[in-house]
């Protein structure tokens, strides 16, 4: 019998316990042996819970029990999760986690510990929630050189942007609806709306693709706070919708660029039709071409099911999984991983007339003039040209309020 421990009994942790109880027979059959939860670590009082006898307060209880073979970490963050996970791996216990912040920051180190101590460190749920992407990328796409990954990886912001389009809601009203439905944090939704959640996810995928650690702090990241209903309407005029896109590109020379930013997505692009809390990730391989992974990105039981699938893999394969799921340590780079490739851009400026915007940005067209300024569509520019244009706007008393890159017509 395989004994496991769960660290943290919040939404995902309790979901893992529920999945293991409800689908015990199927999980045990796939693992090749019965799977049983022996401990649940959580400082809160669960004396009234049916599994109250499983709760412990100290990680040492788990570390000192040789029967525990797999540890599920669902605490979140890094303050407690990182040292606990490190100790578990060093003791030869496999770890399965949904903790994107920990994987994005310490992934290379923890993968190295798993290999060194003949165990597994698995994190399928850290990027797609219940939508598989980690396992398909390191197994099914192993014969491909991946050049690009882009997609919608945050269900909260996608739900908000969908409602800003469908219901003509402002950012604040869309956030309020998301909070009322439990899609956004009520106390502090900044990880979602400012793009940090998506940044951690694309950092993990970038590390997998590149074979070395890519850090979130090197990825330019912008959220959706600056999006207005007027921007949504202007996007419609351009045949587009606005989506928060996380992306990475790897050049033939080994160069890496990555980012998280709201973008204009043409309606002919398959990412444009991904709505509500659904996620979609497009992966471009040299042999397979384009493949899309689509599904709900979060939720108690979908996420828990991905974690439990990792538990099964850890029990069946152990450290062998790291023959393909592994990346090397690396130091953070100086500067940001920006993309020098020119693209079309939507720019909203305040404090200057449309004619001035046209003179500064060059070839393009005015999309909207309702502001104290205008919205201008730039046919072709790169990051350097946009930065220079922003300086010129400021020099004549204006300011740049929003910049949105337009994705290609088809992806």
Enumerate the language-model features and the residues they cover:
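Rossmann-fold NAD(P)-binding glycine/threonine-rich loop
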Residues: 81-87, 91, 100-138
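Substrate-binding/catalytic subdomain of NAD(P)-dependent oxidoreductase enzymes
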Residues: 173-273, 278-280
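A conserved regulatory-domain signal marking ACT and ACT-like small-molecule sensing domains
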Residues: 311-411
């Amino acid at each position: 019998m395989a004994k496991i421990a769960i660290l943290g009994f919040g939404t995902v942790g309790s979901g893992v316990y529920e999945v293991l109880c409800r689908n015990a027979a199927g999980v045990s059959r796939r693992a090749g042996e019965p799977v049983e939860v022996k401990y649940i670590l959580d400082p809160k009082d669960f004396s009234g819970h049916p599994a109250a006898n499983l709760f412990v307060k100290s990680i040492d209880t788990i570390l000192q029990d040789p029967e525990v073979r797999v540890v599920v970490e669902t605490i979140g963050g890094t303050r407690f999760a990182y040292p606990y996970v490190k100790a578990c791996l060093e003791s030869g216990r496999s770890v399965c986690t949904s903790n994107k912040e920990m994987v994005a920051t310490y992934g290379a180190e923890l993968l190295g510990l798993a290999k060194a101590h003949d165990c597994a460190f698995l994190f399928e749920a850290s990027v797609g929630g219940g939508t598989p992407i980690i396992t398909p990328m390191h197994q099914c796409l192993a014969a491909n050189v991946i050049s690009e990954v882009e997609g919608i990886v945050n269900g909260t912001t996608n739900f908000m942007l969908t409602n800003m389009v469908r219901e003509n809601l402002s950012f604040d009203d869309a956030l309020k609806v998301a909070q009322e439905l439990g899609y956004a944090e009520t106390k502090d939704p900044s990880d979602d709306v400012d793009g940090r959640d998506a940044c951690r996810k694309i950092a993990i995928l970038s590390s997998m693709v590149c074979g070395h650690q890519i850090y979130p702090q090197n990825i330019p990241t912008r959220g959706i706070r600056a999006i207005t209903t007027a921007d949504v309407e202007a996007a419609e005029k351009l045949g587009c919708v606005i989506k928060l896109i996380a992306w990475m590109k790897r050049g033939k020379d080994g160069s890496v660029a990555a980012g998280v930013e709201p973008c204009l997505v043409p309606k002919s692009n398959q990412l444009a039709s991904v709505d509500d809390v659904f996620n979609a990730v497009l992966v471009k391989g040299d042999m397979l071409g384009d493949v899309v992974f689509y599904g709900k990105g979060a939720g108690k039981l979908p996420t828990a099911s991905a974690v439990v699938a990792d538990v099964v893999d850890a029990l069946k394969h152990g450290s062998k999984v790291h023959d393909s799921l592994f990346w090397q340590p690396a130091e953070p780079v100086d500067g940001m991983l920006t993309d020098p490739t020119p693209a079309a851009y939507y720019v909203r400026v305040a404090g200057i007339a449309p004619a001035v915007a046209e003179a500064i940005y060059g070839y393009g067209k005015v999309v909207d003039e309702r502001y104290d300024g205008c919205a201008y569509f730039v046919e072709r520019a790169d990051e350097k040209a946009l930065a220079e244009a922003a300086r010129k706007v400021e020099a004549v008393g204006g300011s740049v309020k929003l910049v949105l890159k337009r994705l290609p017509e088809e992806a």
